[in-house]
Amino acid sequence: MEPLRVLELYSGIGGMHHALRESHIPAHVVAAIDVNTVANEVYKHNFPHTHLLSKTIEGISLEDFDKLSFNMILMSPPCQPFTRIGLQGDMTDPRTTSFLYILDILPRLQKLPKYILLENVKGFEVSSTRGLLIQTIEACGFQYQEFLLSPSSLGIPNSRLRYFLIAKLQSEPFPFQAPGQILMEFPKIVTVEPQKYAVVEESQPRVQRTGPRICAESSSTQSSGKDTILFKLETVEERDRKHQQDSDLSVQMLKDFLEDGDTDEYLLPPKLLLRYALLLDIVKPTSRRSMCFTKGYGSYIEGTGSVLQAAEDAQIENIYKSLPDLPPEEKIAKLSMLKLRYFTPKEIANLQGFPPEFGFPEKTTVKQRYRLLGNSLNVHVVAKLLTVLCEGFGNASESCHKMPLILDSNSKILS
């Protein structure tokens, strides 16, 4: 069987390409396209032999797309027009132009691709752009299914709820297809023995867990999951939810994804400790959760991602209870006892499923690394969706053990 010829649009730092490798589907990326030169340097660092085009998508003609002769499209269009905290410009946002161009040329290709996978933020599912996407692929004869999924549903201690669409050019619907509904979990794939994701593994497992869950995005004022008192700006509901997350033994601990060695350069500076102590989302190495890491991580505090309490034995409740009565210098001294630090870029990459060999060029700054990772995706989530999408193609059927794709009886859906 000939390998799939894959076109990777908005390729970024190569998350889709890594997911394709992890899925073990026979495939070859014929071209990766992105306009971000910094992201392209990282992509080239990790995939030096892939044909990488550093140009706008709308600058590529229909004829040039036809010459690539691809039968799969992987894409993650710009999310800013659809973010819940943004302006939600949707189709009127200039950053949507390239995606609208894709939808325009798709029906006019000499040969339609057989497979499509798209990733975007939660919020895309209620956009006019999504409506045009569905209208276009239906007119082309694709069967499709939409999802809202988080890495926590794979046992990964990170919340990153994202919209996904998988589409296949065929007349028969997917076995798990729910027309007009968005699935909140993976179709169940039965495996012989689930495996855990480990940072030190040379190759990542194709399928991990058979008991799906869904974890909502964290709010911007979260705190530690095991606290029994409200010592920060959080609600009782937030505290209880975080405690429930940390009690879920099917989710791995953060320590499985952390770097060894000296990380003092990532300690929060005193002025940030003093100013934002009540807004920090603090987790420990033994925690089983973390907030979504955004492109502003390391530059902004509120809502950009969790910070790690490196001093595990320090009593965070006692320290926070003592703060109101202390002068600024003593507050800083108390908070410094927690050894609060940012997650390193490598640790965030680990949580997002990038393989151990993934790396950045030396000239890529820490700020750039955080920004690029914040704009990327979870490799494990996409790899599993690719396995579902291409079930029956090449090694994909072997990775599924040729088991049927079904949904649990308690499947969650969003109408």
Curated annotation (Swiss-Prot):
Describe what happens without this gene.
Mice are viable and fertile, but show loss of 5-methylcytidine(38) in tRNA. Mice show delayed endochondral ossification, accompanied by a reduction of the haematopoietic stem and progenitor cell population. Defects are caused by impaired protein synthesis in the bone marrow and codon mistranslation by tRNAs. Mice lacking both Nsun2 and Trdmt1 display a complete loss of cytosine-C5 tRNA methylation, leading to development defects and impaired cellular differentiation causing lethality before P3.
Principal location: cytoplasm
Q: Which PANTHER family match?
A: TRNA (CYTOSINE(38)-C(5))-METHYLTRANSFERASE
The active site consists of C79
Q: Which GO terms describe its molecular function?
A: RNA binding; tRNA (cytidine-5-)-methyltransferase activity; tRNA methyltransferase activity
Protein name according to UniProt: tRNA (cytosine(38)-C(5))-methyltransferase
- What gene is it encoded by? Trdmt1
What EC number(s) are associated with this protein in UniProt?
A: 2.1.1.204
Where, by residue number, does S-adenosyl-L-methionine bind? I13, G14, G15, D34, I57, E58, S76, S376
Coiled-coil residue spans? none
Listed SUPFAM superfamilies:
S-adenosyl-L-methionine-dependent methyltransferases (SSF53335)
SAM-dependent MTase C5-type domain residues: 4-396
- GO BP, one example? tRNA stabilization
